[in-house]
Amino acid sequence: MIKKEEKISNLFKYYFDIRMIRILLLGAISGFPWVLIGSSLSLWLKEEGLSRSTIGWAGLIFGVYAFNYLWAPLIDRIQIPFLTKKIGHRRGWIVLMQLVILISLILWSLINPSENLALLISIGLVIAIASSTQDITVDALRIEQVGENETKSMAAGAAMAVVGWWTAVSYTHLTLPTRSTVV
């Protein structure tokens, strides 16, 4: 019986590594933009009285996530001036993408969709590109932090990233106003 308890405690020790907490948080920051582009945008356009087909076309923004592998090699090679030297290559990209997402969200909040749908969709596309670029960088940082030779930690890191992502998505869904609470 003692051996089983030791095995279970050995299994969980990988999840309590400080690197896993960082990976969990990185997963969470990857989840927030996904909900904003998806659920929030759909709700916003619906509240503005736009048609279902228009809302459906706006959903094509998600297509960016399917093609982020195309610019992943560029992310590995291009260094962000000042940030790369100060905080490192991957963290520099993450901070830059967070800044792009923040600025885009501020601009997004100032747009009336029924008056300027093209600009709204364009900024949504910028958010999606920045978010998918951030996802590339978060995954690369996770792999670098854990190390390819630590297979159990690598598996725990992948799990923590997914848990972080889903936690952010779930939390955002729970805290967003629903149709009945939108004034």
PLM ranges: what are they?
Residues 155-171:
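Glycine-rich segments within core transmembrane alpha-helices of 12-TM secondary carriers
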Residues 57-79:
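Central cavity-lining transmembrane alpha-helices of secondary-active solute carriers
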Residues 135-160:
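Cytoplasmic helix-loop-helix junction between adjacent transmembrane helices
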Residues 95-113:
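C-terminal ends and interior cores of transmembrane alpha-helices
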Residues 78-97:
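Cytoplasmic membrane-interface "Motif A"-like loop-to-helix N-cap segments
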Residues 172-178:
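Conserved small/polar residues in nucleotide/adenosyl-binding loops
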Residues 10-62:
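Helix-loop boundary and gating motifs at the non-cytosolic
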Residues 117-134:
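Hydrophobic core of transmembrane alpha-helices in multi-pass small-molecule transporters
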